[in-house]
């Protein structure tokens, strides 16, 4: 649906058909490799009887005379092409259904789909379910609508909002975002090393196997692996991860398989996931030679024109696939994410180019001067005598035209590697501007934005395109090792993650709990509470077992959301996650929530803890801001110095102007009353670690007979102070004074 929204149905069908370039690559490469006699072609160039026609060097019946390897290559690529065509043919009916959905139900003509804002489409979809609560779900022909709004007759009829629609569209992507955020995927290369060679390899490069040895091999020395490289993701590896993980977790309808939320199937699911990793590793190893050959041919056809037209583009950069998954936020639609990253490219390039490269600059200036001098002489000579341009050979069979192209390319590349003379050197301000759009600032970067360490780390995320291309080629060889040796030990943690971080939402289905913005379970509001290692004692709502439900909770203890339910675990085994493991790293969920609210200002969260979190943030911002502006204090990560760098989200006065002060004040007062009333309640025994915080309110909240506990400081300043933990120094905390802004939406954080 998101693709149709951005392109229109006709454009989408045309785009998908043009994506099937495999046939052209197969046909043209076969012609070049098998159908031309290159010995006759090149030998004839130096003889008086030079061949002047193509038919003189063609080989008759070239396809049938091909070698076995070439024939096998053609068969494999042809099978892949047929697979692509079949997928395209199967997608056409769905695109037509979506076209009818937009045209007849939403009333949006195909010509307007490309320009209609996404919030307007969300509003139209919500109105359909509001005005057609029965017919919209009972019409068997409206498959596109059923996929969008659901067909669960038992679910209460409720108008779909932007959050529900985003959870449906990004149901699978949200799990991948969470897996990368929690660093559950080991993407380092591991190569098994025979025991006799371990003495010749540095011990720092050797690691032990993460899998326990088989009973029959326990007497043998433990296997060691040669491990190198950091977590690195390529398109080939990403495709394999989607197949192994998402193809395993979801059924054909795109819904989470029920067995993944049950503890009793854990062992079978872990073994099944390991087998998928191993099987795909073997499959990738078998087809690796053919994939490399295809990528080389395809890349040559694709990039030659680009680099020929603009040779300096060989030094251009882009974000790596791994960086994109680290930057992306929960429930962030692709077109919004791409727009956010696109706005950071120029500043990111300026930041990378700012760091001193005196030696490189001196060498490139000299190379540019020499290449420019040769090119100038040849160009002037060609202007004086035009015949020299095509007929004068500087070296055998190499005319002035050839060397003008060579020197021009060298000149363009060398100039691209020389920084501009008028560039202002301020890497800290530049990186702050980049963070404003990427929303990524690890803890170890705080206070070090000017350092070479941060520059090197960022350069790995914002890499040269040519290096990304070579990484893609190399990954074809290394992906089998990652799938076969690195990922199988992660299977147990991945299955546990799928089970523990999957919740059921009425009318939406099973989704990743981070994407629900469940502050009661995952909110990083009370950071001062010691870790218990017990599931359920996480977040602000997991009250102390003694008394007083308000202690340390930051005022965010909430009952069951009106729409959300959760699965019951079949087993009462202890949780495998500690308290800190329930929270997203780098406060990804909190900043995703604020970013989603800023992107969809009309959306009102249905979960009380989320609403209270937002209202208290805005209330604190209103108290702290000067007249005419908004500033609040919500920070989950460190920021740099000036320039608005940091982690978090801001909402400026233009967005807040849409929220009437009276309505906001009344709403805040209602939450204050709800909080005052809920402070007399506490959760019962949390010894059952698998009880979800969002179970039915009658099952999880009881009246406390004792006195009322300390509510703690639940203001936004109190929340920010509690965030200042985990060894974070005062100097680092001072960097929290500013936040990034996104799409014209800004909060200025001040403590």
UniProtKB/Swiss-Prot annotation:
It is a multi-pass membrane protein. This is Autophagy-related protein 9. Residues 277-297, 466-486 dip into the membrane without crossing it. GO terms for biological process: autophagy of mitochondrion; lipid transport; piecemeal microautophagy of the nucleus; protein localization to phagophore assembly site; reticulophagy. It comes from Cryptococcus gattii (Filobasidiella gattii). The gene is ATG9. It catalyses: a 1,2-diacyl-sn-glycero-3-phosphocholine(in) = a 1,2-diacyl-sn-glycero-3-phosphocholine(out); a 1,2-diacyl-sn-glycero-3-phospho-L-serine(in) = a 1,2-diacyl-sn-glycero-3-phospho-L-serine(out); a 1,2-diacyl-sn-glycero-3-phosphoethanolamine(in) = a 1,2-diacyl-sn-glycero-3-phosphoethanolamine(out); a 1,2-diacyl-sn-glycero-3-phospho-(1D-myo-inositol-3-phosphate)(in) = a 1,2-diacyl-sn-glycero-3-phospho-(1D-myo-inositol-3-phosphate)(out). Pfam families: ATG9. Residues 544-557 have a biased composition (Gly residues). It is found in: Preautophagosomal structure membrane; Cytoplasmic vesicle membrane; Golgi apparatus membrane; Endoplasmic reticulum membrane. PANTHER family: APG9 AUTOPHAGY 9, AUTOPHAGY-RELATED PROTEIN 9. Belongs to the ATG9 family. Phospholipid scramblase involved in autophagy and cytoplasm to vacuole transport (Cvt) vesicle formation. Cycles between the preautophagosomal structure/phagophore assembly site (PAS) and the cytoplasmic vesicle pool and supplies membrane for the growing autophagosome. Lipid scramblase activity plays a key role in preautophagosomal structure/phagophore assembly by distributing the phospholipids that arrive through ATG2 from the cytoplasmic to the luminal leaflet of the bilayer, thereby driving autophagosomal membrane expansion. Required for mitophagy.
């Amino acid at each position: 649906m998101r693709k149709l929204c951005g392109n229109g149905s006709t454009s989408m069908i045309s785009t998908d058909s043009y994506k099937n370039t495999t046939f052209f690559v197969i046909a043209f490469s076969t012609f070049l490799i098998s159908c031309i006699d290159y010995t006759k072609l090149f030998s004839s160039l130096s003889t008086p009887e030079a061949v002047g026609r193509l038919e003189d060097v063609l080989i008759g019946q070239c396809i049938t005379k091909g070698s076995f390897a070439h024939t096998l290559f053609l068969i494999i690529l042809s099978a892949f092409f047929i697979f692509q065509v079949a997928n395209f043919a199967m997608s056409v009916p769905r695109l037509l259904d979506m076209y009818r959905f937009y045209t007849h139900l939403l009333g949006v003509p195909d010509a307007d789909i490309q320009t209609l804002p996404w919030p307007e489409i969300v509003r139209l979809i919500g109105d359909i379910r509001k005005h057609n609560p029965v017919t919209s779900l009972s019409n068997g022909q409206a498959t596109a609508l059923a996929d969008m709004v659901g067909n669960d007759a038992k679910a209460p009829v409720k108008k779909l909002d932007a959050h529900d629609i985003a959870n449906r569209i990004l149901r699978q992507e949200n799990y991948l975002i969470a897996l990368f955020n929690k660093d559950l995927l080991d993407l380092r290369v591991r190569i098994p090393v025979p025991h006799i060679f371990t003495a010749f390899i540095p011990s720092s490069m050797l690691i032990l196997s993460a899998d326990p040895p088989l009973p029959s091999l326990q007497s043998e020395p433990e296997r060691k692996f040669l491990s190198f490289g950091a977590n690195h993701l390529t398109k080939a590896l990403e495709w394999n991860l989607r197949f192994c993980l998402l193809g395993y977790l979801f059924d054909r309808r795109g819904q989470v398989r029920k067995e993944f939320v049950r503890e009793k199937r854990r062992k079978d699911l872990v073994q099944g996931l390991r087998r998928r990793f191993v099987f795909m590793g073997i499959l990738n190893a078998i087809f690796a030679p053919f994939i490399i050959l295809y990528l080389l041919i395809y890349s040559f056809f694709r990039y030659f024109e680009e680099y020929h037209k603009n040779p300096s583009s060989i030094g251009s950069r882009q974000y790596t696939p791994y960086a994109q998954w680290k930057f992306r936020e929960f429930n962030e639609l692709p077109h919004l994410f791409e727009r956010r990253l696109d706005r950071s490219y120029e500043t990111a390039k300026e930041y990378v180019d700012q760091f001193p490269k005196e030696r490189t600059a001196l060498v490139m200036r000299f190379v540019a001067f020499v290449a420019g001098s040769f090119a100038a002489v040849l160009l002037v000579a060609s202007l004086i005598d035009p015949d020299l341009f095509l007929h004068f050979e500087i070296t055998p069979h190499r005319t002035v035209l050839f060397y003008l192209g060579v020197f021009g390319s060298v000149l363009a590349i060398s100039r691209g590697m020389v920084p501009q003379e008028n560039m202002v050197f301020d890497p800290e301000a530049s990186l702050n501007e980049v963070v404003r759009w990427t929303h990524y600032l690890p803890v170890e970067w705080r206070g070090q934005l000017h350092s070479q360490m941060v520059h090197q780390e960022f350069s790995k995320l914002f890499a040269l395109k040519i290096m990304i291309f070579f990484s893609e080629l190399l990954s074809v060889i290394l992906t089998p090792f990652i799938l076969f040796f690195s990922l199988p030990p992660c299977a147990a943690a991945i299955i546990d993650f799928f089970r523990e971080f999957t919740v059921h939402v009425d009318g939406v289905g099973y989704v990743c709990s981070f994407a629900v913005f469940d502050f009661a379970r995952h909110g990083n509001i009370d950071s001062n509470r010691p870790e218990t290692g017990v599931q359920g004692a996480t977040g602000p709502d997991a009250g102390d077992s003694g008394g007083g439900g308000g202690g340390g909770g930051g005022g965010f203890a909430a009952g069951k959301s009106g729409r959300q339910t959760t699965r019951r675990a079949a087993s009462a085994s202890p949780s495998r996650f500690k308290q800190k493991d329930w929270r997203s790293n780098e406060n990804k969920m909190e900043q995703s929530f604020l970013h989603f609210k800023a992107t969809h200002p009309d959306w009102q969260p249905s979960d009380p803890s989320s609403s209270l979190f937002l209202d208290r943030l805005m209330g604190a911002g209103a108290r702290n801001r000067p007249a005419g502006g908004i500033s609040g204090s919500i920070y989950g990560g460190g920021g740099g110095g000036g320039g608005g760098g940091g982690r978090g989200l801001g909402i400026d006065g233009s967005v807040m102007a849409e929220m009437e002060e009276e309505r906001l004040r009344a709403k805040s007062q209602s939450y204050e009353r709800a909080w005052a009333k809920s402070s007399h309640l506490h959760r019962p025994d949390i010894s059952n670690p698998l009880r979800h915080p969002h179970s039915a309110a009658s099952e999880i909240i009881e009246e406390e007979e004792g006195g009322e506990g300390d509510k703690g400081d639940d203001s936004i300043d109190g929340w920010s102070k509690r965030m200042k933990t985990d060894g974070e120094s005062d100097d680092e905390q001072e960097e929290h004074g500013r936040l990034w802004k996104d799409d014209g939406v800004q909060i200025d954080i001040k403590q």
